[in-house]
Amino acid sequence: MSLSGGPAVEAVVINWKRPRNVAKIVDALRRQSVRPTITIVDCHPDWRYRLPRFTLAKADRVYRQHRNLGSFNRYVPVGAYDHEFTYFADDDMLPGSRCIEHFLDTKPAEFGVLGQIGRRLNADGSYSRRGVVRTEQLEPVDFLIRGYFVPTQRLDCVNRLRWQLGLQQEPSVEDDMLLSVAMELIYGLKSFVTPAHNDPESKQNKVELRARHALAKRPDHFDRRVAFLRQAKAAGWSSSHGLGWPAEGQDQVPLRYHG
């Protein structure tokens, strides 16, 4: 439960340049079988991307800021997050109506981050976009993308590791990786993809939305992610299944995408 005795989960979504997507996501969150508190972090750069008033009225909480920190914007109001769990939703997908319920039903007693789209390093330690196959049980992963279900009281680790790695001045942090790495390095908590479920309403990406302005389309996107993983490794992090690390100059292994 929240500190005020309300819902156990706070669902957070960023509005930057996809207000139509955010409006749809807010509606999908309001239809959840287990209703979360809905929070919008509104950091749109100009009037073209502002949210309609009816969407803002449907949210329980709205935080407005003018400095863009990329996906790290979701962590700026972390001092105000006061529910037992926080679900961070990317703004390019719609969850099914039982998505929050699914996370609550499948969470282990101790965990750092839960999600449904996970990544592990390749066998040679290089970065891969290949998704971890979900099975009938929780599967450990190195990090998750696009949606993150976390124990709120542990979120302080994100900024702690950001300072330790010297990323406090970085305008766009690889925040998905930072979240999982911080949970493991600071609290010893693992990240998992949840068990596969044949109910489409349990999916965090039941419907895919337009993904214009996506950070993944940056020309240096994978170089930045590899660079972050090197920093994490230097800080003591290792892959969830003890993989090695590529030698210098071996990062450009051909990447394959499997959904």
Where are these predicted regions, by residue range?
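N-proximal low-complexity "stem/linker" segments adjacent to membrane-targeting elements
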Residues: 1-28
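C-terminal catalytic/acceptor-binding lobe
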Residues: 6, 20-25, 164-259
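Short, acidic, metal-binding catalytic loop of nucleotide-sugar glycosyltransferases
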Residues: 27-37
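A conserved acidic beta->alpha catalytic loop
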Residues: 42-51
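A short, glycine-/small-residue-rich helix N-cap motif at loop->alpha-helix starts
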Residues: 65-73, 172-173
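Active-site nucleotide-sugar/metal-binding loop of Leloir-type enzymes
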Residues: 75-85
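Conserved catalytic core of nucleotide-sugar-dependent glycosyltransferases
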Residues: 78, 94-166
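Short beta-strand-to-loop acidic/aromatic patch adjacent to the donor-nucleotide binding site
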Residues: 84-94
